[in-house]
């Protein structure tokens, strides 16, 4: 670049630079090569220099062409490989004939090409290995030559010391002045790795490219300028491909900006390049590039350079080799002396350090065309000014050398100086002068001839070795810079272009291969069409034949299977028919066995006659010919009987034998129990009736026992005969009379019969529910006073004492035994089962036997294990939910006959329950056989058949609609429930979930959900009650008398001080004498405000400073029309009109408050004028007017007033409820106690307080009796009505009871119903399922002031007895609240004639028993039953299920299929009633009475 500065005449602003800088830089680069040129060999050295430069460019061109060939070979090889692979992939399905020899013809050419390619690759490898050895030898020679040059340079170091010292001084100032050199040296050190790769390529060259330059420029300028490029190369080596693209884009942008700055210079240089002759390039000699290590694979592996840097360098070198043939260099003639040239060099170095021109002006390269066929790449390269001038110089030097040689050969005779002058003259028009002095000494310089010892041209100036090396180093750096610029800018573009070309070529190859494949397939389809058609037809024929035979085999197999299946079905059907016949015979055998036994027992005890039913002849046709008493008892094993071979007659005989055997076993068991008892008891007389032999009893009629203290009715006496016959036969039974027919007295009468007629006084065991224990004890004591009763209940210690009365030695008790009958509960039986099982009981009675309806319960199992001669079950509802409960009772009394529940279920349960649920057709024959089996063991009479004086009860279902709050709660529950609502309703209708003890977790969750819905139907307050609302009271409350009394006694001054009283003024004497004043207002505000006296006197107190007194005087005196001094005529007229003698009275009244005027008028003096006469009525009214507001007299005289206040004023409710309340702030005026007392006592005015409050009763008594004050003289009190006083005197708001009633549909209807029933004189039983609902009902009854009592499960046994007694004897009690489970069993509540079910039980029989507490013997009035239901809720589903259960009971017990008579009344939102009749007509009077009650 220094040569370009010398040639550039326009650069005249270069600053001075130190001359010693070159010396300092020379020491750092002392190992640079310098050519020793002799003065006598100037032309030879120039020629050598030009030849060396030409060889450099030729070597670069050759390297690029080899690289291009190598890349083309690799690309073609890869494409051929991909083409072959794709072709093979597409030709996999080609089929060839194995016998044809031409099957591999299409592969032979391909194999031949592949072998040729492999051979070429081997030759190329050998060529590369040979070149590698030559490169190594050349490197060794270059190193020897460098050693020689170093020795030459050491000799010249002494000559350069002076210049070096001067350069250091100047350089030091420059560095301290600018502060740039240190940073550039650091950047140069960081770029050493990249510069090393470029210097390696320079060492491979034969000679140095440049001969001019400056050492200082190399050390400072070149290093500084190369830092950016080298740093970018380092970044390219360290970063990924993504970062490479970013760096390339940044470099391209920088280069583009540099190109824009020198567009004008490039245009001029390109015009000069186009004028050059192409003949000038013939002088360059071509040499082989033996040092090409870049294309050797082995050497390339050892080099760890960046791929982007190496590819960019190669591409730039290729581009430069193509452009060297187009550049022309000019011959350089120096006309100035050595100091001027040195100054120009210093200016050149300082110019590069300037900030504005610090950047290099890089070369621009553009690819214009690429021909892949000829492997020709056309590149347009635009060089900057410096590069163009350098090439011009080189080309001109070569041209001059060529002309000089031609002149020498032709003997022109021109010497070297003339030639130089000609050359200088020819090129003088193209050169620019460095300064004004160059033109003056131009001719002298051309005439001088210089000879140098080192062989380098000095161009007419004296140049030492150091300056020559600097110029050489400059051209070396310029050469490196050119390659860096081209590598950085153009390599990426060329790489992208090559990749694009390769992708296009790959696409074309792929398309070509696909086209070849298609063409090959066409050829194949033409040649092999007949073969393919033949194969297709053969395959189709084979497939059709295979399908035909497969179809044929499948049809034969299906036909065979069908025949086998029909045969199996026929055999199965025959087996099923045979099995059904066998099962029918088994069922008939079992039924016949049971019927024979039942028929025999029925004839003995005559159950049909006792029930009042006529027996048809058809019922006993099958039993007339067989007498089981005459047959020999023989037990036939049921499983050993051959039901297939034996006929019906033989099976009947076997069944009769089994029935006879069962009868014999029953008798033997009873005889064994009696014999064992007789062995330990008293011996009986021989002539006494032997009751142990029932066959000798015959038909006898038992009379009522004499020890029974009552008279049995006819049907009860028949029941006694039936029970006695059962005992005689040793058979257990079920007394299932309808509730209220006296099952208790019948069971007591049979005990009296055994004691009186058979001298069996026990031990007898009676097990009852806990609620009927006292009733049984009372009944036995009442009807059998001679019996000793042992009530067995209480705690563990009490029961332990009671067990001492047991006599375990004697199995039969006498009259003098410790006890005769022990009464206990089911709970005690389970608790003390171990003790009770040790006793042998003569007779065990189970009251309310539905308690053992479950065969899985501990009650059933424990009671079944007791040792008893006979068992008697008392129940009004033997079937509550299903037929399984009936089987449990039957198995309990006859385990030998009813031993299998599955058989019983097969006989009756399925048919009857399905009939009740699905209303299917009932098998009447099967129902008749069931009744025949049950009759000997169960006696049931209905009230209407045996008790004519007891009328039918009227049942009415009252349907209500949900209120708004209930409907919202119901919908919220339905939306929040996780289970389907239909499943919940089904669970509500499932009876097993409510009674079974072993419910699953899911069923229990369903039941809980059902209970939530039932709570909504009953009352929404079951979820959340409305609380009492009270504001925060910012108040100091007054202390009551009791608190003050305790405070005085304890000398607690804090309480008294809070009450604004002095302890000294109080004494126990005053407290005990009651000298306290009753105050209706005692609360005070905790805040006390002290009003300044100045403000009071100036603003409030009337004075001359304000108009307070004037305004009051004007308003009350001057503007008052009743002032006599102003309006005398009006006052006189009013005085005459009213008879008031004083004219000032009107003025006084007008200034008196209204309340005080009313009080004064009522308390005014009586008129004692003798002329006024009053009647007795008027005097009584006068007394009435002044009567006190409390007491009996006030209540009697003010009935109308109290009714008005209760009905109307009570409805007034507070509309606003404040959150905070406080009395007025206490105001005190400092220094004025009068004002403070008047303000504080404003609410305690005696006249107002007395008028608003009531005089206590004790005070009235003392005033009238002790002090003798007449009643008419009492002050008027109670002017403020009590309801308003209750509602407005306090901010505490309680929940409204009216709203409490109206928010529940059931309670609202019940409220209307109770009003009617109360007015008509009825007494009501109300049954509940929830005790919490009973609590709410008690609040309602207290609000309505209905007299009521309550009995639930928490009531004690002694309390239950007293409650029942009070209900039966006290007619003032209007309502009896009972829980269905606790109050629905075993108690007599005939004092009530109305039963209301607020919510129904799961089991309809529980409700039936609860109804019969009132509808039983002793009831003389019509009984009406109301059932409250909510329409469209879960209660309707429960009611439907209850009706199905009731139908099952009717079918089994009565044989009826008609629905029960129930009247339904639907109450809508507007309280309109719609009556729906039942299936059977009932008493019209009862319906009218019930309807009138609901009206």
UniProtKB/Swiss-Prot annotation:
Catalytic reaction annotation: ATP + H2O = ADP + phosphate + H(+)
Cell compartment(s), UniProt: Nucleus
EC number: 3.6.4.-
Family annotation (PROSITE patterns): DBINO, HELICASE_ATP_BIND_1, HELICASE_CTER
Limits of the Helicase ATP-binding domain: 724-896
GO cellular component, one term: Ino80 complex
Family annotation (Pfam families): DBINO (PF13892), Helicase_C (PF00271), SNF2-rel_dom (PF00176)
Keyword Heme: no
Keywords noted in UniProt: Activator, ATP-binding, DNA damage, DNA repair, DNA-binding, Hydrolase, Nucleotide-binding, Nucleus, Phosphoprotein, Transcription, Transcription regulation
Residues modified to Phosphoserine: 65, 115, 133, 616
Residues annotated as binding ATP: 737-744
Domain DBINO: from-to ranges: 482-607
GO process terms (BP): DNA repair; DNA-templated transcription; regulation of macromolecule metabolic process
Compositional bias of kind Basic and acidic residues: 399-408
Subunit organization: Component of the chromatin-remodeling INO80 complex, at least composed of ARP4, ARP5, ARP8, RVB1, RVB2, TAF14, NHP10, IES1, IES3, IES4, IES6, ACT1, IES2, IES5 and INO80.
Notes concerning its domains: The DBINO region is involved in binding to DNA.
PANTHER family registered for this protein in UniProt: CHROMATIN-REMODELING ATPASE INO80, HELICASE SRCAP-RELATED
Function: ATPase component of the INO80 complex which remodels chromatin by shifting nucleosomes and is involved in DNA repair. Its ability to induce transcription of some phosphate-responsive genes is modulated by inositol polyphosphates. The INO80 complex is involved in DNA repair by associating with 'Ser-129' phosphorylated H2A histones as a response to DNA damage.
Protein's recorded name: Chromatin-remodeling ATPase INO80
């Amino acid at each position: 670049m220094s040569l370009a500065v010398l040639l550039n005449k326009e650069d005249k602003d270069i600053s001075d630079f130190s001359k010693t800088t070159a010396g300092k830089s020379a020491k750092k680069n002392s190992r640079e090569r310098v050519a020793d040129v002799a003065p006598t060999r100037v032309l030879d050295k120039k020629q050598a220099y030009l030849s060396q430069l030409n060889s450099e460019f030729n070597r670069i061109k050759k390297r690029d062409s080899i690289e291009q060939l190598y890349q083309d070979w690799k690309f073609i090889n890869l494409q051929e490989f991909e083409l072959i692979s794709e072709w093979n992939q597409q030709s996999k399905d080609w089929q060839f004939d194995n016998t044809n020899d031409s099957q591999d013809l299409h592969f032979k050419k391909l194999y031949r090409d592949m072998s040729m390619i492999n051979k070429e690759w081997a030759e190329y490898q050998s060529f590369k290995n040979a070149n590698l050895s030559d490169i190594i030898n050349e490197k060794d020679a270059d190193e020897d030559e460098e050693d020689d040059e170093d020795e030459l340079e050491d000799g010249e170091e002494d000559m350069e010391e002076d210049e070096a010292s001067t350069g250091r001084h100047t350089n030091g100032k420059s560095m301290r002045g600018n502060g740039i050199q240190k940073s550039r040296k650091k950047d140069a050190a960081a770029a050493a790795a990249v510069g090393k790769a470029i210097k390696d390529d320079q060492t491979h060259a034969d000679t140095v490219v440049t001969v001019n330059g400056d050492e200082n420029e190399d050390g400072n300028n070149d290093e500084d300028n190369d830092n950016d490029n080298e740093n970018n190369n380092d970044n390219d080596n360290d970063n990924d491909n993504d970062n490479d693209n970013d760096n390339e884009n940044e470099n391209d942008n920088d280069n583009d900006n540099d190109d824009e700055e020198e567009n004008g210079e490039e245009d001029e240089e390109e015009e000069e390049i186009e004028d050059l002759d192409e003949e000038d390039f013939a002088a360059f000699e071509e040499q082989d590039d033996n040092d090409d290590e870049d294309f050797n694979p082995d050497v390339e592996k050892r080099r760890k350079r960046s791929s982007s840097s190496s590819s960019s360098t190669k591409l730039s070198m290729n581009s430069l080799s193509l452009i060297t043939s187009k550049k022309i260099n000019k011959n350089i003639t120096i006309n100035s002396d050595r100091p001027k040239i040195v100054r120009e060099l210093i200016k050149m170095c300082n110019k590069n350090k300037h900030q504005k021109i610090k950047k290099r002006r890089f070369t621009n390269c553009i690819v214009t065309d690429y021909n892949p066929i000829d492997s020709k790449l056309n590149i347009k390269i635009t060089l900057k000014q410096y590069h163009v001038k350098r090439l011009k110089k080189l080309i001109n030097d070569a041209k001059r050398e060529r002309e000089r040689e031609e002149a020498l050969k032709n003997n022109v005779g021109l010497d070297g100086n003339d030639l130089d002058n000609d050359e200088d003259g020819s090129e003088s028009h193209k050169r620019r002068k460095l300064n004004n002095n160059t033109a003056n000494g131009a001719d002298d310089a051309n005439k001088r001839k210089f000879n140098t010892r080192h062989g380098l041209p000095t161009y007419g100036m004296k140049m030492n070795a150091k300056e020559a090396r600097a110029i050489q180093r400059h051209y070396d750096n310029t050469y490196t810079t050119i390659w860096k610029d081209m590598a950085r800018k153009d390599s990426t573009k060329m790489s992208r272009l090559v990749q694009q070309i390769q992708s296009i070529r790959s696409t074309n190859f792929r398309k070509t291969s696909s086209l070849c494949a298609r063409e090959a397939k066409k050829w194949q389809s033409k040649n092999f069409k007949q073969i393919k058609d033949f194969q297709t037809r053969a395959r189709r024929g084979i497939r059709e034949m295979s399908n035909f035979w497969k179809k044929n085999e499948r049809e034969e197999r299906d036909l065979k299977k069908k025949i086998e299946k029909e045969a199996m079905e026929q055999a199965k059907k025959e087996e099923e028919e045979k099995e059904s016949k066998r099962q029918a015979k088994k069922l008939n055998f079992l039924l016949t066995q049971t019927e024979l036994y039942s028929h025999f027992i029925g004839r003995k005890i005559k159950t049909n006659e006792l029930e009042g039913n006529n027996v048809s002849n058809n019922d006993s046709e099958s039993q007339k010919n067989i007498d089981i008493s005459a047959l020999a008892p023989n037990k036939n094993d049921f499983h050993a009987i051959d039901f297939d071979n034996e006929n019906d007659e033989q099976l009947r005989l076997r069944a009769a034998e089994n029935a006879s055997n069962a009868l014999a076993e029953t008798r033997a068991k009873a005889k064994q129990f009696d014999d064992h008892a007789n062995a330990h008891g008293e011996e009986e007389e021989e002539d006494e009736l032997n009751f142990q032999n029932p066959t000798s009893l015959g038909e006898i009629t038992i009379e009522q026992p004499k020890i029974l203290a009552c008279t049995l009715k006819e049907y009860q006496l028949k029941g006694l005969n039936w029970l006695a016959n059962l005992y005689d036969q040793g058979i257990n039974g079920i007394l299932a009379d309808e509730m209220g027919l006296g099952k208790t007295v019948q069971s007591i009468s049979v005990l009296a019969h055994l004691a009186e007629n058979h001298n069996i006084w026990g031990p007898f065991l009676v097990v009852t529910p806990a609620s009927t224990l006292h009733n049984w004890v009372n009944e036995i004591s009442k009807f059998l006073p001679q019996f000793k009763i042992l009530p067995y209940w209480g705690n563990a210690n009490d029961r332990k004492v009671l067990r001492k009365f047991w006599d375990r030695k004697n199995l039969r008790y006498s009259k003098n035994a410790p006890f005769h009958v022990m009464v206990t509960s089911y709970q005690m039986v389970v608790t003390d089962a171990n003790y009770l099982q040790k006793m042998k009981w003569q007779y065990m009675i189970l009251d309310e036997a539905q308690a053992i309806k479950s065969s899985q319960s501990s009650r059933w199992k424990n009671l079944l294990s007791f040792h008893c001669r006979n068992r008697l079950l008392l129940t009004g509802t033997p079937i509550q939910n299903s037929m399984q409960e009936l089987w449990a009772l039957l198995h309990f009394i006859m385990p030998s006959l009813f031993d299998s529940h599955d058989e019983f279920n097969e006989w009756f349960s399925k048919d009857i329950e399905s009939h009740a649920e699905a209303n299917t057709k009932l098998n009447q024959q099967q129902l008749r056989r069931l009744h025949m089996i049950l009759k000997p063991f169960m006696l049931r009479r209905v009230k209407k058949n045996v008790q004519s004086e007891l009328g039918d009860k009227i049942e009415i279902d009252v349907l209500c609609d949900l209120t708004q709050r209930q409907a919202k709660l119901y919908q919220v529950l339905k939306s929040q429930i996780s289970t389907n609502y239909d499943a919940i309703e089904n669970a509500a209708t499932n009876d097993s979930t409510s009674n079974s003890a072993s419910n699953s977790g899911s069923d229990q969750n369903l039941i809980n959900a059902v209970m939530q819905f039932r709570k909504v139907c009953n009352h929404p307050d079951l979820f959340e009650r409305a609380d009492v609302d009270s504001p925060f009271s910012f108040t100091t409350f007054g202390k009551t008398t009791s608190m003050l009394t305790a405070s005085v006694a304890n000398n607690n001054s804090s309480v008294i001080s809070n009450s604004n009283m002095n302890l000294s003024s109080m004494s126990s004497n005053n407290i005990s004498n009651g000298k306290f004043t009753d105050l209706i207002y005692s609360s005070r505000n905790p805040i006390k405000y002290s009003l300044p006296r100045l403000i009071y006197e100036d603003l409030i107190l009337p004075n001359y400073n304000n108009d307070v007194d004037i305004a009051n005087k004007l308003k009350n005196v001057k503007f008052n029309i009743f002032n006599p001094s102003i309006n005398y005529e009006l006052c006189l007229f009013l005085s005459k009109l009213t008879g008031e003698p004083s004219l000032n009275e009107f003025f006084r009244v007008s200034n008196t408050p209204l309340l005080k005027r009313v009080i004064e008028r009522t308390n005014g003096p009586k008129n004692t004028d003798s002329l006024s006469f009053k009647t007795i009525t008027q005097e009584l009214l006068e007394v009435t007017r002044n009567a006190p507001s409390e007491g009996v007299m006030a209540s009697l005289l003010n009935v109308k007033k109290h009714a008005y206040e209760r009905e109307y004023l009570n409805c007034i409710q507070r509309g606003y409820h404040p959150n905070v309340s406080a009395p007025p702030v206490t105001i005190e005026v400092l220094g004025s106690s009068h004002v403070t007392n008047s303000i504080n006592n404003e609410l305690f005015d005696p006249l107002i307080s007395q008028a608003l409050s009531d005089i206590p009763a004790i005070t009235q008594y003392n005033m009238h009796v002790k002090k003798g004050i007449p009643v008419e003289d009492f002050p008027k009190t109670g002017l403020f009505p009590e309801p308003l006083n209750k509602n407005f005197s306090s901010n505490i708001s309680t929940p409204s009871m009216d709203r409490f009633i109206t928010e529940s549909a059931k309670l609202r209807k019940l409220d209307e119903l109770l009003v009617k029933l109360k007015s008509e004189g009825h007494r009501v039983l109300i049954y509940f399922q929830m005790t919490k609902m009973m609590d709410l009902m008690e609040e309602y009854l207290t609000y309505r002031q209905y007299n009521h009592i309550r009995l639930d499960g928490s009531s004690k046994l002694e309390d239950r007895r007293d409650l029942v007694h009070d209900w039966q004897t006290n007619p003032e009690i209007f309502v009896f609240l009972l829980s269905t489970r606790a109050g629905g069993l075993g108690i007599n509540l005939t004092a009530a004639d109305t039963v209301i079910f607020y919510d129904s039980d799961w089991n309809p029989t529980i409700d039936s028993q609860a109804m019969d507490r009132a509808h039983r013997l002793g009831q003389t009035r019509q009984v009406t039953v109301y059932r409250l239901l909510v329409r469209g809720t879960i209660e309707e589903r429960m009611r439907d299920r209850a009706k199905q259960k009731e139908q099952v009971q009717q079918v089994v017990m009565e044989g009826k299929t008609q629905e029960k008579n129930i009247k339904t009344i639907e109450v809508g939102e507007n309280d309109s009633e719609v009556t729906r009749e039942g299936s059977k007509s009932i008493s019209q009077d009862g319906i009218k009475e019930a309807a009138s009650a609901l009206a």
